[in-house]
Amino acid sequence: MTEKELLAARQSIVQKLTQARLEKGLSQEQLAKRIGTQRSNICRIEKGTQNLSLDLMIKIAEALDKDVSVMLEERSSTMEKVYSLRLYDETLLTFTLEERGLEGLQATILRTETAKQKLFPLDLELTNEGVVKWLERRVIPKNRQFVDEILKTLGLSVNNTKGIMDVCMGLSLNDSYWVVPADFDGKYADYNLYENRFSEALSLVAYTGVGGSREAFSTSPELTTNGMLRKAWRFVEDDGIYLYKGGTEGAANTGNEPYSEYYACQIADKMGIGCVQYDLENWKGILASKCRLFTDIDTSFVPIGRILRKTTLKACLDYYKTLGDEFYEQLCSMLVFDALIYNEDRHFGNFGLLRNNHTGEIIAPAPIFDNGLSLFNYAMPDDFKNLSAYAKTRSNPYRISYEDVCKEVMGAKQKAQLRRMVDFKFTRHPSLNLPEERLTAIEKQLGERTRELLSIPVQRSTKRKNEPER
């Protein structure tokens, strides 16, 4: 349905209600008093300068003795496919969304609030295809553990993007956008995941893979959370929202990711690099790393891969330079930190930026998080007999050696941060730890790695002077 067709359908309903008012011999003032509103609202609706909400349509129809069901059917046929992308209660984009057989899910943009464009998602391409891609990226990924169990609880399939959106409204703990029918009257304050309790039952399904029957309605961050491991968001009374994340399973060398999260954040702390704090907990008999949500209702996280047109390390470094020294230095420090701990999974989806939701401004680098595939988490006991040799077999996702990355980004600040790691020892958890011999071997390797990285000369300051402005 085009915007013109949508407007015509709305006008048809309003005209019928206006005609019914005139047949009753009621003035706009009299009708307004009957339904408990202002005459100005009736006037604007009949002039077409104010949209007719569902609640107001029902009240007017009942006051005029019109069949509400007929009105609802007519309204439903025009509105059931029309959605709005909102930031809080502000509409940014209005579009239709429908399944079209072999064509799959199709969107048609009806209206763009261009005056609010600085508030739009940074990764939203304002085309019909771009809207569909944005929605598909927003829902639970197909490779997430227990994805089928999570969606089965709600009577949905992994390919049903529209159905998932209809259930979860696109609500997320990454930002404050949501996607609802265009005539939806609800307020963000009553539905957002930051301030309202979400489905504990669905969190258990997400973490354990075991759950019950479909709930009538379930707002849940599980339907918009990325990543492949078992995980769940939990609201801890008087404390906040936490992410519980398990480890890999199915082989002798799996399951160590929660330990790596716990120990790696100690290294970041020692180096003085902003990072998310992790703890360990056995929840439902399964070891999990536990961290507090680092976004809030006013601040969103934007993965760098959602911003860059070309996802390469060079493009990323160039972009961070345009943001200023604080951003660039944090990125360089993260890359040196990753080289130190042999992080094998620093992809373009698990680091990025913090954004002010009200202004659209990028305000800070996001804290470092998601370090589970580091500190030799997959190493077998035999690998620890010669950990230095095993370390040389580790690699990052960039297809560039850790050492070559460090040669590019090493600066005086990173050198100072590395010096703090001399003679570093982990703080043991009170009850949940890797075997002591494994921890001791990792500490020894960290000492050797620190000295290796400190031997890399600082070339960055001279090199940057010769680089052209971007």
What are these regions (language model features)?
Residues 15-34, 59:
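Short basic helix-loop element that most often maps to the first helix and adjoining turn
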Residues 347-348, 352:
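Canonical protein kinase catalytic loop motif
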Residues 23, 49-52, 343:
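Helix-turn-helix/winged-helix DNA-binding modules
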Residues 1-23:
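A short, Lys/Arg-rich alpha-helix, primarily the initiator
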Residues 33-51:
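Recognition helix of helix-turn-helix/homeodomain-like DNA-binding domains
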Residues 76-336, 340-342, 354-470:
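Phosphate/dinucleotide-binding and metal-coordinating scaffold of catalytic cores
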Residues 55-70:
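DNA major-groove recognition helix of helix-turn-helix/homeodomain DNA-binding modules
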